[in-house]
């Protein structure tokens, strides 16, 4: 595959709504919350949709939805701390160049002494690939109903069945009634458009995209997003370092050229 365009993203996702399980929602609705401690954020799934941009030939919009499992520790005025979990969702759109090829591809599967199986027709339209590392939990807070955001941007009306199964069958509360939990996450990702193409070319070391498609700003003093802005992009997480004995022209991060999504819960059952 040939990569036609790519970009990297280092984003601070501020105040993302967490849709809690029913038991967790009842806990925070009871009030008396003393503190909220962020514990863990796990990326469950990424949903990708690629569409051609009509007014700009060769360019495509890539709409991405990230699904996270969020775990926090809530301390109440009375009683011991409780662990709660829920679902957070973040939507992102980027525009990348993918070329104008539109060839139709027909292929078959070989059958000895029989008629070959005709495979489903395909095309060489670009494919979007999103590489992400698990996000970093930067902040968490519970907001009272009278001050929470009840706009449409916070509304989630439907959750894929495969995502719901990651919460042990517990129902997720999608309504905007009652107290709400918000978290701030730091996320690194690489997004690219690629096509199947017949080329013979030499292979070099890792190539980190030059373009930055982050769309989050930097907060104020002691802001979690400001802290996250000081983090280095984790190149080795996307491109595992090679052995020094490989004899390559470029090695490690010093040689960096700045130039099927499976929805599961991390088990192989």
Briefly describe each language-model feature range:
Residues 1-269:
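Viral structural modules
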């Amino acid at each position: 595959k040939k990569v036609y365009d790519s970009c990297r993203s280092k984003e601070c996702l501020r105040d993302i709504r967490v849709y809690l399980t029913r038991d967790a929602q009842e806990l925070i609705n009871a009030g008396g919350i003393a503190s909220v401690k962020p514990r863990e954020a796990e990326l469950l799934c990424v949903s990708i949709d690629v569409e051609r941009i009509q007014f700009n030939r060769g360019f495509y919009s890539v709409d991405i939805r990230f699904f996270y499992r969020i775990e926090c520790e809530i301390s109440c005025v009375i009683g011991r701390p409780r662990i709660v979990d829920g679902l957070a969702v973040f939507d992102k759109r980027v525009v990348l160049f993918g070329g104008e090829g539109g060839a139709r591809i027909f292929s078959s599967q070989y059958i000895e002494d029989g008629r070959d199986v005709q495979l489903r027709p395909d095309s060489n339209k670009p494919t979007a690939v999103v590489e992400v590392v698990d996000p970093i939990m930067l902040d968490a807070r519970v907001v009272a109903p009278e001050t929470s955001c009840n706009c449409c941007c916070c509304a989630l009306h439907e959750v894929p069945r495969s995502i719901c199964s990651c919460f042990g069958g517990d129902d997720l509360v999608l309504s905007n009634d009652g107290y709400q939990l918000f978290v701030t996450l730091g996320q690194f990702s690489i997004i690219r458009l690629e096509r199947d193409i017949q080329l013979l070319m030499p292979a070099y070391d890792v190539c980190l995209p030059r373009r930055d498609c982050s769309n989050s700003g930097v907060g104020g003093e002691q802001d979690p997003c400001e802290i996250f802005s000081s983090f280095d992009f984790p190149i080795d997480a996307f491109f595992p370092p090679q052995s020094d004995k490989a004899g390559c022209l470029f090695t490690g991060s010093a040689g960096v050229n700045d130039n099927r999504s499976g929805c599961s819960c991390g088990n192989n059952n």
